[in-house]
C-alpha cells in the first residue's frame, strides 16, 4: 500500500492507461507544459509529447468536438475541463454528439471519451466557477456519470472510465485534490455503476457523494457518540443510479436522508426521490429528507459561500428529526 494524494491518484490512473493503450490521449487547457490546473497531468507532456498531451485554445466547444471525432475513429480521448463549469460552452457537443451518436448511428459509432475536471463549491471561485453540473448532464441520454470522493475510488473509477466504450462524465471536487489515502500497489479497477457502502447501520440510510461524503462522516462521529447507528452510502454512480443498493438499504432502515452539494431544484436528490416514490414508497416509515445547496448563485464572499452548502451540524439535526 502507498499513501497518495487524490490528484496524484488521478495522474497515476491516466499514466497507467496511456502506457497500456497508445490510443489514449488527453487534451484541454494547460494540460501539457503546465501540468493541468490542479496538476493531474503533471509530467505527462514530457513523457508522451505533444501528440498525446495536447494543450488547446480556450475554445471548449471546438476541442470537445475534436475529441468526439477522435473517439469515432477509434481513439480514447480524455478531455480535461480546467473547470467543469466551462463545459457549458461545449454542451451541444456533449449532448447531441457524445451522448447520442452511438444510438443515432445504429451502433456503428462508439464514443469512448472521458470528460473530467474540477467542480463544486470551494476556494472562493465565484458563481461562474462553482457550478454543480451533475444534474445538467443527468438528463442527457447516453452518458454515464460518476463522482469520485477518495483517492482510492478516483483511481479505480478513472481507469474503468477510460476503458469504457461510452462517454463518461467524471466529476472531481476542487476541495478533495489534496486528500490522502492508501492505494494498493497492484492494478485495480472499480465499477462505474455501483454505489459504495461506506458504513453499515440500522437506523437511517444516508445517501451522499463527492465532498459531502466527508461532511456526512464527520456528522456520523457525533451521531454514534449519541447512540445513533446510521448507514452511509456513497452513490459514486450518478447515472445510472445504483437503485438496487439504495433499495436494499432502505428495506433495512426504512428512513432516508440525501445529502448533496447539487442544487435542490431538479438535482440528483430529486431524481432519487422520484425513483424511490415510484418503486419503494411502501418501505418508508418517514418522509425522505433532502439536504441540498441553496438555489442561488454561489457567492464570492467566503462566509456567504459556506452558507450555501450543507455542513455536519445540519446532517446531525436531520437524523435526529426522523430517528
Swiss-Prot record:
Pfam entry (one): Transket_pyr
Q: Where does thiamine diphosphate bind?
A: 60
Q: Which SUPFAM superfamilies match?
A: Thiamin diphosphate-binding fold (THDP-binding) (SSF52518), TK C-terminal domain-like (SSF52922)
Q: Where does K(+) bind?
A: 113, 161-162, 164, 166
**Cofactor requirements of the protein:** thiamine diphosphate
Keywords (A to Z) from UniProt? Chloroplast, Metal-binding, Oxidoreductase, Plastid, Potassium, Pyruvate, Thiamine pyrophosphate
The record's annotation in InterPro entries points to: THDP-binding, Transketo_C/PFOR_II, Transketolase-like_Pyr-bd, Transketolase_C
Protein encoded by which gene? pdhB
Q: What are this entry's molecular-function GO terms?
A: metal ion binding; pyruvate dehydrogenase (acetyl-transferring) activity
Q: What is its EC number?
A: 1.2.4.1
What name does this protein carry? Pyruvate dehydrogenase E1 component subunit beta
Location within or outside the cell: Plastid, Chloroplast
Q: What this chain does, per the record? A: The pyruvate dehydrogenase complex catalyzes the overall conversion of pyruvate to acetyl-CoA and CO(2). It contains multiple copies of three enzymatic components: pyruvate dehydrogenase (E1), dihydrolipoamide acetyltransferase (E2) and lipoamide dehydrogenase (E3).
Reaction catalysis annotation: N(6)-[(R)-lipoyl]-L-lysyl-[protein] + pyruvate + H(+) = N(6)-[(R)-S(8)-acetyldihydrolipoyl]-L-lysyl-[protein] + CO2
NCBIfam families the record matches: PRK09212.1 (NF006667)
Q: Does the keyword Membrane apply?
A: no
Q: What Gene Ontology cellular component terms go with this record?
A: chloroplast
How is this protein organized at the quaternary level?
Heterodimer of an alpha and a beta chain.
